[in-house]
Amino acid sequence: MGIKKFKPTTNGRRNMTALDFAEITASRPEKSLTEKLSKKGGRNNQGRLTVRHQGGGHKRKYRIIDFKRNKDGIAGRIATIEYDPNRSANIALVHYIDGEKRYILAPKGLKVDMQVMSGVEADIKVGNALPLSNIPVGTLIHNIELKPGKGGQLVRSAGTSAQLLGKDGKYAIVRLQSGETRMILATCRATVGAVGNEEHELVNIGKAGRSRWLGKRPTVRGSVMNPVDHPHGGGEGRAPIGRSGPLTPWGKPALGYKTRKKNKASDKYIVRRSKK
């Protein structure tokens, strides 16, 4: 999709950009594949804030996405490419020849009326899902499983892709979008191609209100809070931090402090750390 610019009719629209939705072919989702989505406002079941900067926004319906891609050996036709408000990537509605309908992530290059398939017999073609053991080395992939049958967990955002670098026994070696290289069981599935809608990161929101439409609340600086709310808070006027270095709202060192658990069980699968 291309980027649409707006005329500077107001200050908010002066540098605003949006996607032109040229690839979108349907305005309403498949009713049988949607669910009610209630707002949580970033709170957990105790009512406590666990994710900051969430709340409000336009009402949404959740689209049920097939991340498992386990409908083996049955061809499906791409019926529509649709917008999904719950993720950065677009989604594609697949009509299988046995009558079932499913949503999948829309990879780059996928068009209406193209065919997709899952399973070991599927061709190496954009949108097809196979075990890593059946995918040639060097192929770009997305929607990668970490446990066989659990469904894709890695590389699902717009414009992202991973590359299959090699195979070593029962493991496949994959370079992820972050630059990290890790081993994944070769029986895990992945989908061929890169995730579409790669211009998503180029969109300029333009004004605060548009962020609120998306359910994003403001990010407030710690230095303008009270001491009860943030380690940087309090003091008279624009006071310095008063500590040896900047801290998170929970008192942990900020800016470069490593938060990954030491001796994590999955460390042995990481061949090379991500680039900083």
Swiss-Prot record:
Gene Ontology terms: cellular component: large ribosomal subunit
Annotated segments matching region Disordered: 30-57, 219-276
Sorted UniProt keywords: Ribonucleoprotein, Ribosomal protein, RNA-binding, rRNA-binding
Keyword hit for rRNA-binding: yes
PANTHER family: LARGE RIBOSOMAL SUBUNIT PROTEIN UL2M, RIBOSOMAL PROTEIN L2
Quaternary structure (record): Part of the 50S ribosomal subunit. Forms a bridge to the 30S subunit in the 70S ribosome.
Entry function: One of the primary rRNA binding proteins. Required for association of the 30S and 50S subunits to form the 70S ribosome, for tRNA binding and peptide bond formation. It has been suggested to have peptidyltransferase activity; this is somewhat controversial. Makes several contacts with the 16S rRNA in the 70S ribosome.
Protein name: Large ribosomal subunit protein uL2
Organism, scientific name: Exiguobacterium sibiricum (strain DSM 17290 / CCUG 55495 / CIP 109462 / JCM 13490 / 255-15)
Gene transcribed to yield this protein: rplB
